Curated annotation (Swiss-Prot):
Its cofactor is Zn(2+). It is an enzyme of class 2 (transferase). L-methionine binds at I420, G421, S422, E473, D588. This is 5-methyltetrahydropteroyltriglutamate--homocysteine methyltransferase. It comes from the Bacteria. Pfam families: Meth_synt_1, Meth_synt_2. Keywords: Amino-acid biosynthesis, Metal-binding, Methionine biosynthesis, Methyltransferase, Repeat, Transferase, Zinc. One of its GO terms (biological process) is methylation. Belongs to the vitamin-B12 independent methionine synthase family. Binds 1 zinc ion per subunit.
Length: 745
């Protein structure tokens, strides 16, 4: 019989119990022993769920207090020297992730092309890896008590781990330093009764992986020789694996391949017979989107694969970390739509149905699921309608002309100061919003409260002497979900939460049908804010690429059509803002880089579509209207031409945790438009010093002119506390004024 495996399960819990426990601990409202007790109960609940769902190989080690890459760094003592004064305990673990009053946090980067963030391992001259504790063994022993021999340890492989690290001088030598530690972890697991061990090596779906195949042979030869009893699974996901003709010869028991995002290439490799002597762990249920699987199409795929492999195991295409837990609470949705959704728990059920069908037993549940899938495909809200783009202006006047008109209109100083958009959402804001959602607060009272917050923060910004203000986004839970609630073709969930970084969870909207602008999105709040001040207030919108990348997108039309549908909707809102006297409009594309395909050969088509959509949204404005955009966590040297092609008057970039890397991009490539490189890290509660911000500004001015440079935090301030936000912005403004004086002299 075919088996079913899982790669990873969401940490958050059905009601975000994980987030609540960790944040209570950070706030000093929960003792460590109580935190550990609550997290253990969550882990056990997740294990039991998967066992009851019929999963034969249940992941262990996917659960974390913050991030699984940080777990590995902590286990192997890859600890930045600046944290030497800490004992090796949970306080240190969280300090690395979040920073403290004296030390900046480690860098945070996107996990491949997802919206999940990992903590970058830092290697220094003083780094001395050793097995500080075998936490994976502890988790495995705990899991065996619950699920027995179904427990399958999961660990990020050494080649991927080092690839994701900073400070690497000699790549292969660094990998070799880790091998004895991995060996000890594996041997301890085998001695404790483990059989299958999943080693995640997603670096081998990237172009970089092609350069690492020889190292992989050396590494996995070592593991096979030193821990011969282990049944290793070489796991990839998010794309087709590279160099499978060589990787398939590695001395491992099985290979995990993604047949959702790399179907054609991976299937071709299978049909070449590369896995006839291997177990294949086939990722055939989408681990990154929330639509029910097409059972018949997937069953046909399995029948294609089956004859070419030694043994077949079914699994999701990736960890289920990237989807919500369960659809059972989404009773408010249209029944046809709800029945067409599949979150983590439903995906496990789909795998069970497919395994049974592949073994020749199409159960009643199989036919019911097939019927629900067919009903969604036939629904009348799913068309492929796209307004004609023939009348849409795609090019603006030359930047120099626009710059002069905008300078005359806005009258800003050199090095203008601003923020990215959002301000802290206090407990009072959350309380009022919840009361409003539950019907305990009238629409008018809620709007009055939001206006009070806008008025208060406009005054705060004026007191700080910021140059360009924002309304603060107090009406928004999330920069994408908010728009999903107001545009046609979107819906939102009650508990469809997904982990983004640390304890931060997002609730992506679902794009289920054609997207259209049917009502103002942020007009009222923005115009009200502008009425309170003579300084310019930015209109704050989210761009079409970010809305798509941070939503669960429909899978029945092309991405370019979806980009363009959303772009036309955003264009309508921009025109409303401009007509209402808003002179600066920011269209955030925080996730543009995130959506970049992992293979270079596929990237330009995506970037071309992204640039076209941004221009559809923004190019119809007057020359004197200043268009801003914002981007997060990006390797900009790779996409600098496309960023330039967006033709935004000003771009702000989240850079503070990797300021030097970003600066290098602009030292080697001329960027002629306005730009703000984030001068301090908003993801840490630490208040930056004036000297730090001055250094960041001065370094930026070595490759950017004072006429084009803006000073801003590196991201929105929604997750920070009010006091630390004001304190940090005071430092930012003071530092900027000092640099202005230096430039005047």
């Amino acid at each position: 019989m075919v088996k079913v495996s899982n790669l990873g399960y969401p940490r958050l819990g059905e009601q975000r119990e994980w987030k609540q426990a960790i944040e209570a601990f950070w706030a000093g409202n929960l003792e460590q022993k109580d935190l550990e007790k609550q997290l253990k109960q969550l882990r056990i609940n997740h294990l039991k769920k998967q066992k009851e769902a019929g999963i034969d190989l249940i992941p262990v080690g996917d659960f974390s207090c913050y991030d699984h890459v940080l777990d590995l760094s902590f286990q192997f003592n890859i600890i930045p020297k600046r944290f030497d004064e800490y004992e090796r305990n949970l306080d240190l673990y969280f300090a690395i992730a979040r920073g403290d009053k004296d030390n900046v946090a480690s860098s945070m980067k996107k996990w491949f092309n997802t919206n999940y963030h990992y903590i970058v391992p830092e290697w220094e001259v003083e780094t001395k890896p050793h097995l500080q504790n075998n936490y994976l063994l502890d988790l495995y022993l705990e899991a065996r008590e619950v699920v027995g021999d179904k427990a399958k340890p999961v660990i990020t492989g050494p080649i991927t781990y080092v690839s994701l690290s900073s400070g690497i001088v000699d790549f292969e030598a660094t990998v070799q330093r880790l091998l004895p530690l991995y060996k000890q972890v594996f041997q301890d697991l085998i001695d404790a009764g483990a059989t299958y061990i999943q080693i995640d090596e997603p670096i081998f779906v990237t172009d970089e992986g092609e350069l690492l195949v020889d190292i992989a042979k050396s590494v996995y030869d070592f593991f096979a020789r030193e821990v011969p009893q282990a049944h290793f699974i070489f796991q990839t996901y998010f794309e087709s694996a590279v160099c499978l003709d060589k990787l398939s010869k590695l001395p491992v028991t099985g290979f995990g391949l993604d047949f959702i995002h790399g179907r054609a290439e991976n299937l071709a490799a299978v049909k070449q017979g590369l896995f006839r002597e291997k177990e294949l762990f086939a990722g055939i249920v989408n681990g990154r989107n929330i639509w029910a699987v097409n059972l018949e199409e997937t069953l046909a795929l399995l029948e294609e694969i089956g004859p070419f492999v030694k043994r077949l195991t079914l699994q999701p295409s990736s960890s289920l970390l990237h989807v919500p837990v369960t659809t059972k609470y989404e009773t408010h949705l249209d029944p046809v739509l709800k029945n067409g959704l599949s979150f983590a728990d439903e995906k496990l059920k789909e795998l069970e149905l497919l395994a049974s069908a592949f073994d020749g037993n199409k159960t009643k549940g199989y036919h019911e699921a097939l019927s629900r899938f067919s009903a969604l495909q036939a629904a009348d809200f799913r068309h492929v309608a796209l307004e004609s783009l023939a009348e849409v202006k795609l090019e603006r006047s030359p930047y120099k002309l626009r710059q002069a008109l905008q300078a005359e209109k806005l009258q800003l100083p050199i090095l203008p100061t601003t923020t990215i958009g959002s301000f802290p959402q206090s407990p009072e804001i959350r309380k009022k919003r919840l009361a409003w959602k539950r019907g305990n607060l009238s629409d008018s009272d809620y709007k009055d409260f939001i206006k009070t917050e806008i008025r208060r923060w406009i005054a705060i910004q004026e007191d700080l002497d910021l140059d360009v203000l924002v309304h603060g986004e107090f009406e928004r839970v999330d920069m994408v979900e908010f728009f999903g609630q107001k545009l046609a073709g979107f819906t939102t969930t009650k508990l469809g939460w997904v982990q983004s970084y640390g304890s931060r969870a997002v609730k992506p909207p679902i794009i289920y049908g054609d997207v259209k602008h049917i009502q103002p999105l942020s007009l009222e709040e923005t115009v009200y804010a502008q009425s309170l001040t003579k300084k310019p207030v930015k209109g704050m919108l989210t761009g079409p690429i970010t809305i798509t990348n941070w939503s669960f997108e429909r899978d029945d039309i092309s991405r370019s059509d979806l980009f363009n549908q959303i772009a036309l909707a955003i264009k309508d809102e921009i025109q409303l803002l401009e007509q209402s006297g808003i002179a600066i409009i920011q269209v955030d594309e925080a996730a543009l880089r995130e959506g970049l395909p992992l293979r270079q050969q596929k990237q330009q088509a995506y970037l071309d579509d992204a640039v076209a959509a941004f221009k559809i949204a923004t190019s119809s404005v007057k020359d004197e209207t200043q268009i801003h955009t914002h981007m997060c966590y990006s390797k900009f040297d790779e996409i600098i031409d496309s960023i330039r092609a967006l033709d935004a008057d000003v771009i702000s970039i989240e850079t503070s945790r990797s300021h030097g890397d970003i600066i290098e991009s602009f030292e080697t490539a001329v960027y002629p438009l306005g730009i703000g490189l984030g001068v301090y890290d908003i993801h840490s509660p630490r208040i930056p010093t004036k000297e730090e911000i001055i250094v960041n500004i001065q370094r930026s001015l070595k490759c950017l002119s004072k006429e084009q440079f803006w000073v801003n935090p590196d991201c929105g301030l929604k997750t920070r506390r009010e006091a630390e936000t004001i304190a940090a912005l005071e430092v930012l403004v003071s530092a900027t004024k000092e640099v202005r004086q230096q430039l005047d002299n």
